[in-house]
Amino acid sequence: MSLAARALLPFTLAAALGAQTATMPKSPSAAAPTNPGRGAQSGPAAAPATPKRAEVLRGAYGPFRANNDLLSYGLEVRVDPVAKTIAGKNAVRFRMLTAGTRIQLDLTEDLAVDKILLHGAELKYTREAGAVFVEFPETLKVGQTVAIDFFFSGKPVSKGRFGGMSFEKDAAGRPWIFTADEDDGCEIWFPCKDQWKDEPQEGMTLSVAVPDGLMDVSNGRFEGSKSLGDGYTQWNWRVHYPINSYDVALNIGDYQHFGETYKGLSLDFYALPEDLNKAKVQFAQAKGMLDAFTHYFGPYPFAKDGYKLVQVPYAGMEHQSAVAYGNQFENGYLKRDWTGVGISPRFDFIIIHESGHEWFGNSITAADRSDMWIHEGWTTYLETLYVEYRWGKDDALKYISGLVPKVRNRTPILTEPGVAAEPPQDMYFKGALMIATLRSMLDDDARWFRLLRQFYDRFAYTTTSTDAVIAWWKAALGPVLKFDLTPFFNQYLRRTAIPALELNFDEADGLVMYKWQAEEPGFTMPVEVGSPGHWVTIRPTREWKWMQTSIPKSDFQVRTYLFFVNVSKT
């Protein structure tokens, strides 16, 4: 989701590098730092808190998760807007990877486990925090496919930045119900395997019963609705692709539908009656978004399910094939210039950012929450690519320059794996600026865009890790740049501060000494210095080097709009 939906962060040295988020930040960020350099100055990092047991139970890929591979969900629910309750079952299919008699599923303690059935017989289970440990009477064998029916019910408790599962009303007083659970997980409203690492490989079905007169819009392809004869109508959807747990969504309201086919892809849009005309104008931007992102990364990844935009009462969320939209049918982000440089008012930030997650976050998914920069850093960079596709590279550099003040440099982007905790917002802005810096180091746009496509194709429809992403880019760029990129990635992802180029001038002799101030041993990267029309590439290390220059100290520049670094002159 976008930070803007959360609150986005900026870029440091390179005042104009290149791109912004993927999922948005959930709420506007705190006031940007006044430091005009490369983001806020880093301070001492706080000692990491000991993870709570519940965070580990939810976040760790423990033995009773790792012993099975999720195949599909068949989710059937009934939602009561008056009682504010949900009830139903999830048919969970999985294949055993190691023999065992227990698996772990997840359901918030706020909801009841009514029963869990295997071939009609009740299974025993135990609960701890949100974990549900399901016990089988006989050992399940390696390769065995198992299907259980998990029945549940209760009154969901709204929580998290987006509400989890919330029962609201629209301006006309009609029920407006939604799920948004990236923070607290799918377990907040239905039983699931609440792990990004394992997606249902065969997809899922959703059958959602709501009072007559309301509509449910969920993920996947619409397969029809039917009256249940008791005042309820069931809306049926099928997801044809793997889907990460927090992307599964309900959107229930008095929706009006319109749509079209665009270059063979079905586009479906859902808005409240009073906003229908505004939606028909604003949602037309989806076609320009698709033009841009398919240009760089190839076809829309979920063509069998189609692309949808669904109006919601919060900023937005990247629900797979059913992108949630709440940006008030205005350009920018919630009626403001998101990056403060005059570019974002040209487009609807939520449509671009949240849809960008279809490629990075939904098709390519981080296996662990600690690797979430793969979603947010890359999607933020996609914002910049959208600007470049529409208005050119100069405007893209201007746009990314607005990210710099959003970077905080307080804690590393990468957090402890196996813990259900949100990484810092620097994963958006600092992540995007790091990616833009890679492009500047390569200094070959044609090759860069070929590599972007190859990178996406390699990881599409997979869950992956930071280590795998780094390994790919090391192999792709190392032979060209002729240095090991490991320290580069470690400095930006695993360290708090960004590198600072120290410059020491001896103007009498026309000399300047230079080196990198960086925590990471072995850190090096090229950077361009000089003055307009007289740029040269230098290759500093953590040891002093020198060069001759006729440029006065006051005029000597570092191209920080291309390279995300700080600069210190003495």
PLM regions and their residue ranges:
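N-terminal, polar/Ser/Thr-rich
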Residues: Q20-A87, A172-F178, T486-P487
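Surface-exposed beta-strand/loop patches in extracellular or lumenal glycoproteins
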Residues: K89-D110, P191-P211, D467, A471, ...
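Amphipathic alpha-helical substructures
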Residues: T98, P301, P424-V512
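A surface-exposed beta-strand-loop module
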Residues: T108-D170, W196, D230-G231, K545-I551
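Beta-strand-rich binding/interaction modules
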Residues: V113-L118, V217, R447, L481-T486, ...
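Juxtacatalytic substrate-recognition/specificity segment
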Residues: T179, L206, T233, D254-E358, ...
